[in-house]
């Protein structure tokens, strides 16, 4: 089953209005009302056309509840508020919170650290499932992805702008250098699509890397049967933490030390050789035949 895509199915279904992309190589700019903090990983989007394109990637219907993570100066927030009556903006910087509450008064703006967000509680409060959108601070991309995966039952969709290298890892195929933990877990428990790249010039300050927008769909049809996320994550992490070793060595705590064999002679393969579906089969096998091993 194909569970990841590159550059496919990324058109907007949330609004009939089309966005325009500037033909000039010099993007339009919107003013930044305060100095970005490097400690918060702030690179503010200032191009209105790119903002329209990113917001247009969200497939949420008008009645859906949308949560923006790291709303910053409100470039996405304003456009989201035009499309959705129920909008929550999470922001850790008190300066940005003040700007957001003035600029987008109809949004529920909350001063909070996204790493402390209880997505299930927020979904219950707002009548979920939630749709998440974010120009993600690069240093928070992985924590946010794992947090969303861990609480995916209350989510329907996420549209995240991130470093292009990370986006490519998410949709990577087996037996490639980019294929790893994020690839397996996101392709197993969700449906990620790499939609388009975002040049550094549309941010202020300008980052040193190119970004990309990834849309991640969650739902019952993306859930593997009889497989618990925490168990799968434990096996996948152990396998890729020693990716140059054969699985019989990297997973020896569940196999060799417990006299448990591998299906299909997979013990002779490296982690990068197994597809996400094969990892699911292996995880079910270890769940059935091996005792749990505490996290290191």
Swiss-Prot record:
Q: Which PROSITE patterns match?
A: RRNA_A_DIMETH (PS01131), SAM_RNA_A_N6_MT (PS51689)
Cellular component GO terms held in the UniProt record: cytoplasm
- Give UniProt keywords alphabetically: Cytoplasm, Methyltransferase, RNA-binding, rRNA processing, S-adenosyl-L-methionine, Transferase
Its domain of life reads: Bacteria
Major localisation:
cytoplasm
Q: What does the record give as EC number?
A: 2.1.1.182
Tell me the segments the record calls region Disordered: 1-24
Regions of compositional bias (Basic and acidic residues) in chain numbering: 1-11
The record's InterPro entries line, in alphabetical order, gives: KsgA/Erm, rRNA_Ade_diMease-like_C, rRNA_Ade_Mease_Trfase_CS, rRNA_Ade_methylase_Trfase_N, rRNA_adenine_dimethylase, SAM-dependent_MTases_sf
Q: Which SMART domains match?
A: rADc
Q: Which residues bind S-adenosyl-L-methionine?
A: 43, 45, 70, 91, 113, 135
Q: Where in the cell is it found?
A: Cytoplasm
Q: A single GO molecular function, which one?
A: RNA binding
Instruction: Read off the SUPFAM superfamilies from this record.
Output: S-adenosyl-L-methionine-dependent methyltransferases
Polar residues: compositionally biased ranges: 12-24
Catalytic activity, reaction form: adenosine(1518)/adenosine(1519) in 16S rRNA + 4 S-adenosyl-L-methionine = N(6)-dimethyladenosine(1518)/N(6)-dimethyladenosine(1519) in 16S rRNA + 4 S-adenosyl-L-homocysteine + 4 H(+)
- Entry's HAMAP family? 16SrRNA_methyltr_A
Q: Which family would the database say this protein is a member of?
A: Belongs to the class I-like SAM-binding methyltransferase superfamily. rRNA adenine N(6)-methyltransferase family. RsmA subfamily.
What is this protein for, i.e. what is its function? Specifically dimethylates two adjacent adenosines (A1518 and A1519) in the loop of a conserved hairpin near the 3'-end of 16S rRNA in the 30S particle. May play a critical role in biogenesis of 30S subunits.
Protein name, entry field: Ribosomal RNA small subunit methyltransferase A
Native source species: Salinibacter ruber (strain DSM 13855 / M31)
């Amino acid at each position: 089953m194909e569970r990841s895509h590159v550059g496919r199915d990324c058109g907007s279904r949330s609004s009939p209005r089309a966005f325009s992309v500037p033909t000039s190589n010099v993007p339009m700019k919107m003013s930044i009302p305060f100095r970005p903090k490097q400690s918060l990983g702030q690179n503010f989007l200032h191009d209105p056309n790119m903002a329209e394109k990113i917001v247009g990637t969200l497939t949420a219907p008008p009645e859906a509840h949308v949560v923006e993570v790291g709303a910053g100066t409100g470039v996405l927030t304003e456009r989201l508020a035009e499309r959705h009556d129920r909008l929550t903006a999470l922001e850790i910087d008190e300066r940005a919170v003040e700007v957001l509450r003035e600029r987008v008064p109809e949004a529920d703006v909350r001063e909070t650290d996204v790493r402390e967000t209880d997505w299930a509680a927020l979904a219950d409060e707002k009548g979920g499932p939630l749709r998440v959108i974010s120009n993600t601070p690069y240093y928070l991309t992985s924590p946010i992805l794992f947090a969303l995966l861990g609480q995916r039952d209350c989510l329907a969709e996420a549209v995240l702008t991130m470093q292009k290298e990370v986006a490519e890892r998410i949709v990577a195929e087996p037996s490639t250098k980019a294929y790893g933990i994020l690839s397996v877990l996101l392709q197993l428990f969700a449906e990620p699509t790499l939609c388009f790249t975002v040049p550094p010039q549309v941010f202020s300050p300008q980052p040193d890397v190119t970004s990309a927008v990834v849309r991640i769909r969650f739902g019952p049809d993306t859930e593997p049967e009889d497989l618990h996320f925490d168990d799968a994550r434990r096996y996948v992490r152990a396998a890729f933490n020693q990716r140059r070793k054969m699985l019989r060595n990297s997973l020896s705590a569940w196999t060799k030390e417990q006299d448990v064999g591998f299906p299909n002679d997979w013990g002779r393969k490296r982690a990068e050789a197994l597809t996400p579906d094969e990892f699911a089969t292996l995880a079910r096998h270890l769940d059935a035949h091996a005792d749990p091993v505490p996290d290191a």
